[in-house]
C-alpha cells in the first residue's frame, strides 16, 4: 500500500511536469490543487518552471511564478530557468523571468551565464534584452571565455556586432571587423577573418575595415588586413581609397605602408580629388613630399579645376605652398572659373600665402572668368591686409570686371567702409562708371549702405549722376525703400524730380513699391506729384495700378489730382478699375474720382468693369453715379461689353440699373448682336427676359440670327429660333441667315434653318441662292443638303467671284498699359518679382483681334470686308506672366467649326507645351499648344481654393511599373501626369486627351486607365455621362464637342472628380461585361451576337465582374496568310483569365465558315477536322494555343458549337483538315490579329548636296512634332506629308522610289523600317537625280512588304516629292560627316558579321548612322561616355554650324580616346542609357532592346514642358557679386559664400584618432580566448521524465535534434560564416560616407550576403578566394587539395609564393613595427599567415607540369610552425608529437600526390589528404582523429566557362583503418554514376 501511494505521488509529480512541459495549464493547476509540490523536479533537477521556460509556454511560466515557485532553483548543471529560456531562445519567457526578478548574471556550474548561452545559439533578441537589463558581457566562464568569444567562435555575426557595439556612445552600429579595425584589435580581427576570410567587407556607407584603420591610424590592424588580402585600392562609389584617408589624416607611416603595398597614387574620388589634394588641403607637408616623391600628379584637377596648390592656398598652409612651388607647381594655375591660387588666398584672407605667391611671381592682376581680379575679391570679402598687399605689389586699382565693376564698385555695394576709404585714399575715382554707367554711389544706394554713401559724397561723388537709363542714386534708394539713404541723398542736394528715360521720378518708383516712408520723405522735399511718365501716368496712377492704398491716401492728402488724365485720357480710377483694385476704387470715389471721366475712345471706368466682370467695382461706380448707358466714341455701352464677354451677372446688374438693352452703337449693333457673335446663350436669355428685341437690325440690316448663323453658334441659333426670330430676314444685300450659314460652310446650321422654315430659294440682291454660294466655295456637305430642297429654276448663274458678306463689328482699342518697366529692369535686386518685365507687353484684348475672328479658312484669295468686332486693348494683370509661359496657352475658340475641306494653312507654331495654370472658383481651361486636342477644363465653383493645375507627358519606360498590357492591347496616347496628385474637386472636371488609335476592323474600343501611385493601374469609371456635360460646365463659356466630333478628331474625354497620378488611353478589343453573382447569368457579345457565355447557379460564390470578348477573324486575312488550308471562328475570351468556376460554365461559339457550309460529323476527337483550341495563359503573357478537342465534348446547334469549361480562358474553333498544323496556323494568324492599329502620318524631308545628289529622310510618326526633329537643325526641307494612315504596331514598312529619283543602293537591297508607336521611326535614303535636265522629283511609295514585280501590292501611302534647290556648302558638310578614317584605323570596331559588307565597312556604316540620328542628344551621349565639359565645349566651338558635325567629332574623339578598347557594345550601352535605344534597334534589330534593356539610373521622367523664359535685362548685380568666381554656375569653388571646400569638408568633422578611452568598450576587458583553447559549448538540459509512459513526441524530437547537433564536431565556418556584409550604397557626396560611417545614429545593418563575384579578385591575400587562389583556411574547416582549370591560377600561385617569401624580407611591414609591436603580435608576425589554429592547406589551380611549383609551395608551407587545438588535458609533449606527425603526413601526402599524377592528368587528380579533426564525444570531451581523404572522381560542371569549376567526390575515413576507406570507395563508385556529392561539413 505505501508503495502504491508513493507510486501514485511520483506519477502525479511526473504528470504535473509533463503538463508544464506541454503547456497544459488547466491540467497543471489541477495537479497543484491536488497537492502536488510546485517545486518538484525530474531526475536532472528540472522543475516545471524549467520545462515551461524551455518550451516557451509564457502563460504557464507566469502562472507558476504567481504560484510562488522558487525562481532561482537550479538544475544539476546549475542552470536556472533564465539559463534554459536563453539557451532555447524563448525571448518572451526571458522577459517575464527578468521582469519577475531573475538574476541576469547567474552562473551555472561551469560559469555559463544566460547571456553566454543566448550568444552561443545566435538568439539576437535575447542578447539585446539581457544587455539592456543589466547583463554583464565581461562575466567569463571557468575557462575564461566571454559571450563575445563564443559568438565569434560560432560565427554569429549579428550577435558579435551587437556585443562589440553595445555600450558605445555614438550608437554607430558598424560591422564587427570595422569595430576591430577602429580599436586596433588584431585578435578580434584575426578571429573574424578566420570565420569569414573576406577582409573587404563593406559597411552601409561602402567603406572597408582598411578605410577605418587608415582613418584611425591603426597600423597593427592595417597590416593584418593587408596580409589577409585586403584590397589596398578598394574604391567605394564615392571613390575614396584608404590612401586618400591616410593622406588627409596625416599619418606618415600609414601612407608609406599603403604605398609600399601598391596603393595607386593617382586614384581619384568622385569629385576627382587625388591623395595629394587631401594632403595639401590639410597642410601635411611630409605626406605631400612623400606623395610627390612617388610621382603624384602635381597638376591634377578636381571636377571644378582645383589643383593641390589651390587647396594649400585655401587652407593657409604656407609650407605646403612652398613645397608645391619647389616641385614646380604652376603658380598661376586656373580652375574652371579661371581662379588662380592668389584668387583663393584673397578670398580666404590668407595674407601670408598671398605674400609668398606674389613673392614667387604670381600675377596680381589675373582675371577670373567673369573678370574679377584678386583685388576685387579681397575688397568683396573685406580683407584689408590682403588688399593693401595686392596694391603694393602692382594690382590695378582701376581693374574692371566683365560688367565694368571696379574694386570700388564692389566695396561700395558690399558696404565695406574701411576698404572704400583705403581705395579712395589710394586714388580710386569716386565717379567711375560700369557698363551701365553706374557709379559707386549707385551701388551704395541700391544696397542701402548709408555710411559708405556719406563718405563717397564727402569725396565729391556726384549725387545726381545718371546711369544708362538716366536713373540716379535717388531712384535706386527709392526703389529699395531705404528711407535713411533717401534722406541723406536729398540733404546732399539730390534732385527729387529728375526723371528716367521713361519719365519716372523717384516718387513714381516709391509709389509703385509702396514705400510710404520714402514717399513721405520725397514729398517733404517738394517732389512733384504732377510729373507724368511718357504714358502720362502720375504717381497716383502708379499707386492705383499696383493697389498701394496707403501711398494713394498719402498722395491724396498732399493734394494729388484724383482725375488727372494721362496720355490716353486715363484717370487713376480707370487704372484702378482695370487692375481690379477695389480698395483704391473705394478710396478715389469719395475723394473726387469721377466715374464719368471718359478715356480717349469714350470708355468710362464702368466700361472696363463691365468688360472684366468686376461686379463689386461696378456696384461702387453705379452707386457714385456711373451711367449704365454711357456711350463710347462708337456708341458702345457697358452692356455691350458685358454681353459680348458672356457675363450674365454683370448684364443683369446693368439692366437693373436702367441700362437700355436695345441701344445700338453707331453701326446699330445691339448687345444681342454681340451675344450672337460670341454664342453666350445664358446672356441672351437674360436679355430676352428684359425685353430686348430679337430681330433688331444693324445699319446693314443684319439681325442677331444672321450673326449667329455667320459665326456658327448653333446653340444660339436654336435659342433665337425658339424665341420667334425671323428665319428669312434679309440684309440690305438680300442675304438671309441661310445665305450666311451657306457662305461660312456650317452644314448643321443650314440643316437647322431649313427645318425651321428657311427658304432655300431666296436670292440675294445679286441673284445668288445659298446653293450657288456653297457650290462656289466648294462646301460639299452644304451643297448636298441644299441641292435636294433648292428649286432648280431659281438657280441663277453667278460670276466666278463671290463677294463675301460679313456682319458689322466694332474696332475700338483702349491701351491701359503704362511704359514704365523698361528702365526699371536694371533695378532688379534680390527678391524682385516679375513686375520688372517690360510692361508694354501687358496688353489686354477685350475681344479677339482681327486675325482671330472665326472665318472659313477655305477662301484665302477672296477679298473680305473688314469684320466689325469690339477690340479693346488693356493692360492685363501681371500674374499671368509669373505663373506660366504665355506661349503655352491657346485661347479657346467660341465655336467648333464644321468644315468639309482641309485647311491649307498650317496651324501656328507654339514654342511651349502647357505645364500649369492657376485656377480658382471662377474656373478655367487650358489647351496644349504642342499637342493639339489636349485640354483640361475646370468648371466654375469646382475648386475649393486657388489651385495650380499641372499637366505633363511621361514616357512609359520612365515608369517603375508601366501599364500592364496584354498582347492585343496597346497604349493609344501618351501617359498624362496631372497635378496636384490626389486633388479632389467639388464637382466633375473634364480632361480631353488626344489619341492615335485606329478602330481597325471595328472590333476595338478605348479604355481610360488610371494609376494613383504609378504601380497599380485600373480602369477609370465615372458616374457622369455625356448627358451631364451642360450641368458639369456650370454656365462656363467653353465649347465641348459631341462624341462624334471627338471621335473624328481622335480625342478621348475623361470626366473625373479627382486627379490620379497618371491617366492613359488604352486600345483593346471590345468587351461586354456584367456583374455575375451566385444566382448565375449570361453574357452576350454585341460585336458577334452568336457568341454567348452562360453562368449556372453557384458558378461563383460572390458577385464578381466578368467580361466576354469576341474577336472576329476576317476571312480575307485568313486567305492571305493561309490560303484555303484552314478557316477559323471568332476568338472568344472570358475575362479575367485563369479563373476557376465552382460549376462548369457554358460557351457558344459560331462554327468556322467552311464547316458551316459543309458540315462533317463523321469523326470525333483526333479524327475530326474541327479543332477546339485553347490558351489558358493570363495577364500580359503571350498566348500559347493547344488543341483540347479530344478532352472537350462539342454539341452543334444553329451553326454554333456549345461546350462547357471550368476555367476562363481564350477559345477558338478551327476547321483544319491537317489537324497537326492547327496550332501552328492559329499561332501565325493570332500574331497578325493582335497587332494594335494606329493612325500615323508619313513625313518626307529632303536636302540636295549637289545638283545630282541628295538625301531623303522619311518619318512614320504618331504624335511626334516635325519641329523637334533633327532635320529641322540640318537644313532639310519638308517636301511631302501624308494624311493619317492606318499602320500596325511592329509592321515592316518598305519604301519604293520611282520617277526622276533613284535610290543609291545595291540592286537587291530595299529600304525598310519598322513602325513603333510614339517612337521616332526614321528611314534615311540617299538619292540621285536620274535626268538632270528634268525636274528633280518622283514618287515615293510605302508598302507592307518588299516589292516584287510579279505580285500586286496594296500601297499604304503614295507621295509625290520634289527635291528642294541645292544647298550651298553641302559638299563640305558631306566630307565632315564621314567618320570612316578612324573606324578604318581601329580594327576593334570591325565586327565581322555575315553579309555583303566587311566588318570595317559595317562599323563605318554604323558610326555614320549613329552620327546622323544623334541630333541634339550628342552632348548627352558625350556626358555618358565620360567626356568633360571642356571636351564638349571644344566640340561645339570647332563645329559650330551643324549637329551632324558635332556628332561625328564626338564619335571620332571617342574612338581616338578608347583606341583598341573602342567597342560598339559600349557605344550601344551608352545610347540605351540616354534613351536613344531606337538607334540601336535600327542598327541591330529589335531583339537587342529586350536583351540590353537596363534600369535607367540617371534620368528622371522627361516631359515636354519648357521652363518659363528668363526675364530680359541685365543679370542681377547681387547675383554677380555674391558669386563672382562662379559666374552663375553651380560648380563648387572655394569662393562660394561661406562654402568651405566642398569636396573634403565633411572629413573635417571626423574626430581625431581615438585614444585608449574611445567610445568603444575596452577590448582588454573583453577577453578573446588564448591560443590553443576554444570556448566551451553549452548543451541543453535533459528534459526527459522518469516513469513517463507517453513522452511528448515533439519534445523527444527536439532533444534528439539538439543532442545530435552537439555530438557533431564544433561548428566551423561552414555552419555560420561571419559574413559582415552590407549594402554597398554610398552617399553622393565624396566624403559623406566616411563621416556617416563613424558618426551616424544607430541603424540596422543589412543581412544581405555579398555575392562572390563582388569580392576583389585582384587582392593579393591568401585565403581570400577559395576558387582562384592557394587558400589557407583557419579553424575547424576541413581542407583538401583541389585542382581547377582556371587560367589565372598560375599567376595567383606565383603571387602567393612571393608573399610567402616576402614575410621575412626586409621590406615587409615587420620593419615598421619591430619596436612598437607587443610580444604576442610579434610572435604572430614571425609565424606567418598560417599560424592561426589548426590551419590546413588547400592547393588548387596549378598548371600542367607545375609539380615543382607545387612542391615549392608545399615545402614553404610546411616550414612554418603549425598549431592545432589540443584537448584540455594535453601536455606540451603531446602537442609536439602530434605536430611532428602531422608534418610527416603532409610530406607523405605531397609525395603521394607527385607520384600518382603524371602528364596531362596532373591537373585533374589530386592525391590523398591527411588531416586531423576534432569531434565531441557523448561526454562532451574533445576527441582528435586523423582523417584520410581521397578524391575518386572529378566532375566538370561547366566546360563553357573560362574558369572552369570542378565538383569533387570525396570519400573519407579515419587514418587508423585505411582498409575501410578503400571499401567505402568501392561502394561509393557503384552509386556515383549519376550523382555528385560534396564533402559533408
From Swiss-Prot:
This is Ankyrin-1. Keywords: ANK repeat, Cytoplasm, Cytoskeleton, Disease variant, Elliptocytosis, Hereditary hemolytic anemia, Hydroxylation, Lipoprotein, Membrane, Phosphoprotein, Repeat, Sarcoplasmic reticulum. Residues 890-904, 1683-1694, 1718-1739, 1758-1771 have a biased composition (Polar residues). The modification (3S)-3-hydroxyasparagine is found at residues 105, 233, 431, 464, 629, 662, 728, 761. Residues 1403-1487 form the Death domain. Residues 1234-1362 are annotated as: UPA domain. The modification Phosphotyrosine is found at residue 1073. ANK repeats lie at residues 44-73, 77-106, 110-139, 143-172, 174-201, 205-234, 238-267, 271-300, 304-333, 337-366, 370-399, 403-432, 436-465, 469-498, 502-531, 535-564, 568-597, 601-630, 634-663, 667-696, 700-729, 733-762, 766-795. Residues 913-1068, 1070-1216 form the ZU5 domain. Component of the ankyrin-1 complex in the erythrocyte, composed of ANK1, RHCE, RHAG, SLC4A1, EPB42, GYPA, GYPB and AQP1. Interacts with a number of integral membrane proteins and cytoskeletal proteins. Interacts (via N-terminus) with SPTB/spectrin (beta chain). Also interacts with TTN/titin. Isoform Mu17 interacts with OBSCN isoform 3/obscurin. Interacts with HIF1AN. Interacts (via ANK 1-5 repeats) with RHCE; this interaction mediates the primary membrane attachment site for ANK1. Interacts (via ANK 1-2 repeats) with AQP1 (via the N-terminal). Interacts (via ANK 1-13 repeats) with EPB42. One of its GO terms (cellular component) is sarcolemma. Component of the ankyrin-1 complex, a multiprotein complex involved in the stability and shape of the erythrocyte membrane. Attaches integral membrane proteins to cytoskeletal elements; binds to the erythrocyte membrane protein band 4.2, to Na-K ATPase, to the lymphocyte membrane protein GP85, and to the cytoskeletal proteins fodrin, tubulin, vimentin and desmin. Erythrocyte ankyrins also link spectrin (beta chain) to the cytoplasmic domain of the erythrocytes anion exchange protein; they retain most or all of these binding functions. The modification Phosphoserine is found at residues 429, 759, 781, 817, 834, 856, 1082, 1390, 1392, 1396, 1428, 1486, 1523, 1533, 1617, 1666, 1671, 1686, 1690, 1696. GO terms for molecular function: ATPase binding; cytoskeletal anchor activity; enzyme binding; protein phosphatase binding; spectrin binding; structural constituent of cytoskeleton; structural molecule activity; transmembrane transporter binding. CDD domains: Death_ank1. It comes from Homo sapiens.
